[in-house]
Amino acid sequence: MRNWLLPEYIEDVLPRDAYRIEKIRRLIMDMLFAHGYQFVMPPLLEYVESLLAGSGSGMNLRMFKVVDQLSGRMMGLRADMTPQAARIDAHLLNISGVTRLCYASSVVHTVPDEITRTREPFQVGAELYGHSGIESDLEIQCLLLECLSVSGIHSIHLDLGHIRVFRSLIRDSGIKPEFEMELYAALWAKDISSLKELVRTGLNKRLTRSVQNALLLLPELYGDGTVLLSARQHLPDFPEIGEALDQLEHVARILQPYVDRITFDLADLRGYHYHTGMVFAVYTPGCPAPIALGGRYDEIGKSFGRARPATGFSLDLKQLSQLTDMNGYPSGILAPWKPEDEKLAAMVRQLRAEGHIVVTELPGEENQEVTGCDRKLVFRNGNWEIDPVTG
């Protein structure tokens, strides 16, 4: 057996990539701290019921599970830190006002993402609790755009949706949960033939003609700002739909100067099991999958005894690091081994304080290649100076 082999889609991150990931993590966390988001560190393992709170069956399939040898209960390795942050807000902090939390750590999935091809993403996210207005949705989305900007992502396509459009269409229909899930699956996949069949056979006795037509129209409501105009013209005049469209229009108007492109997708039901309002995804050239996801999820705290308005975003730092133009591990300065030389020690301390990498060459390494150093300290005319490494 080759003991150095890793499981499929689990990988070591080597120095150059690890440095880039860590550099971006620090930039993003500094941005989150500057906006008042407080860092939390939830545990890697929790009881399954807690990790699945308000998340639906999809999360259950993505989660590794183990039996707790102390209690006999089933535990899970987190696949998403959002429910953990919600638990902390609802049960541990128990603050009545607005709470801003952020996190950054690894999560694990039973199967790899189709695009990133890893089962161990490094998730960074921010969550805002206790405010139900569109202003908090805007704060989260503006914050995400700033985090992407400091990470070196400058070409951004923002895609907006709103769960309440679909929910308002079926809210009073009295359809069975299994039909609702079939509808959701057809809309999410934009499977027009299945959607037509569902509306024609399984749902036509429950839905009015205007709602049937609206459901069939939803997959076509994708594109630029004309989508909202078409939605106002053809969707039922439900107050909740009108409010959702107003919110989308308002957010798009404010964020338009900061992104390259904004589109709308009224059939985007990603996270339907827990999202309750506006949802969004961010794309960038060179990656067909979203590089960040987020939205409003006002009911998730109910599972922990305290429902709170909430909105947030998350991204995979490993994926993000592959899309930036940031350089890998920086070159260093090679210093000789002279522990008794006070001038040398002072200069090394100064260089390190200025942010330079200084590597001390250990005895016996003089004739070996030292990777990562393109300069060296040399003693000249009574002073230590920096010279380029030649040869």
UniProtKB/Swiss-Prot annotation:
Subunit (UniProt): Heteromultimer composed of HisG and HisZ subunits.
Record has Amino-acid biosynthesis as a keyword: yes
Family per similarity comment: Belongs to the class-II aminoacyl-tRNA synthetase family. HisZ subfamily.
GO biological process: L-histidine biosynthetic process
Keyword terms of this UniProt record: Amino-acid biosynthesis, Cytoplasm, Histidine biosynthesis
GO cellular component: cytoplasm
Any Pfam family matching the protein: tRNA-synt_His
Function: Required for the first step of histidine biosynthesis. May allow the feedback regulation of ATP phosphoribosyltransferase activity by histidine.
InterPro entries the UniProt entry points to: aa-tRNA-synth_II/BPL/LPL, HisRS-like_core, HisRS/HisZ, HisZ
Top-level lineage group: Bacteria
Intracellular or extracellular location(s): Cytoplasm
Chief location of this protein within or outside the cell: cytoplasm
Pathway per the UniProt entry: Amino-acid biosynthesis; L-histidine biosynthesis; L-histidine from 5-phospho-alpha-D-ribose 1-diphosphate: step 1/9
Native organism taxonomy: Bacteria, Pseudomonadati, Pseudomonadota, Betaproteobacteria, Nitrosomonadales
The protein's name: ATP phosphoribosyltransferase regulatory subunit
Note: This function is generally fulfilled by the C-terminal part of HisG, which is missing in some bacteria such as this one.
